[in-house]
């Protein structure tokens, strides 16, 4: 195995996880903040807002998991070797 390919794969795996978690992290923070603001404005709609928030957080977290899958594929099932 070429050491240059191995090193590039490790760097790419780190970048995949790092960059894949930036967007969803910002989105989750914004969504949670807006949900808290909405519940503060309309306390009677707490259940509906919370349900929608949890569903949207799950979809956002899926993007991070996709980045982790790409990183694991680069680490253990390297297609470039």
Swiss-Prot record:
Compartment(s) where it occurs, according to its Swiss-Prot or TrEMBL record: Plastid, Chloroplast thylakoid membrane
A Pfam family per the record: ATP-synt_C
Chief location category: plastid
Alphabetical list of CDD domains matching this protein: ATP-synt_Fo_c_ATPH
Annotated site residue numbers, Reversibly protonated during proton transport: 61
GO terms for cellular component: chloroplast thylakoid membrane; proton-transporting ATP synthase complex; proton-transporting two-sector ATPase complex, proton-transporting domain
One Gene Ontology molecular-function label: proton-transporting ATP synthase activity, rotational mechanism
Transmembrane domains' residue ranges: 3-23, 53-73
Membrane topology according to the record: Multi-pass membrane protein
Keywords, in A-Z order: ATP synthesis, CF(0), Chloroplast, Hydrogen ion transport, Ion transport, Lipid-binding, Membrane, Plastid, Thylakoid, Transmembrane, Transmembrane helix, Transport
InterPro entries cross-referenced by the UniProt entry: ATP_synth_csu_bac/chlpt, ATP_synth_F0_csu, ATP_synth_F0_csu_DDCD_BS, ATP_synth_F0_csu_sf, ATPase_proteolipid_c-like_dom, F/V-ATP_Csub_sf
Quaternary state and interactors: F-type ATPases have 2 components, F(1) - the catalytic core - and F(0) - the membrane proton channel. F(1) has five subunits: alpha(3), beta(3), gamma(1), delta(1), epsilon(1). F(0) has four main subunits: a(1), b(1), b'(1) and c(10-14). The alpha and beta chains form an alternating ring which encloses part of the gamma chain. F(1) is attached to F(0) by a central stalk formed by the gamma and epsilon chains, while a peripheral stalk is formed by the delta, b and b' chains.
Note, other: In plastids the F-type ATPase is also known as CF(1)CF(0).
Function: F(1)F(0) ATP synthase produces ATP from ADP in the presence of a proton or sodium gradient. F-type ATPases consist of two structural domains, F(1) containing the extramembraneous catalytic core and F(0) containing the membrane proton channel, linked together by a central stalk and a peripheral stalk. During catalysis, ATP synthesis in the catalytic domain of F(1) is coupled via a rotary mechanism of the central stalk subunits to proton translocation. Key component of the F(0) channel; it plays a direct role in translocation across the membrane. A homomeric c-ring of between 10-14 subunits forms the central stalk rotor element with the F(1) delta and epsilon subunits.
Family of this protein: Belongs to the ATPase C chain family.
Listed PANTHER family: ATP SYNTHASE LIPID-BINDING PROTEIN, MITOCHONDRIAL, ATPASE PROTEIN 9
Name of the protein in question: ATP synthase subunit c, chloroplastic
The organism of origin for this protein: Angiopteris evecta
């Amino acid at each position: 195995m070429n050491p240059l390919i191995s090193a590039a794969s490790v760097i790419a795996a780190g970048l995949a996880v790092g960059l894949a978690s930036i967007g969803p992290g910002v989105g989750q923070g914004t969504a949670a903040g807006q949900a808290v603001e909405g519940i503060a404005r309309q306390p009677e709609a707490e259940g509906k807002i919370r349900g929608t928030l949890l569903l949207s957080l799950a979809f956002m977290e899926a993007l991070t998991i996709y980045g982790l899958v790409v990183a694991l594929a680069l680490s253990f099932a390297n297609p470039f070797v």
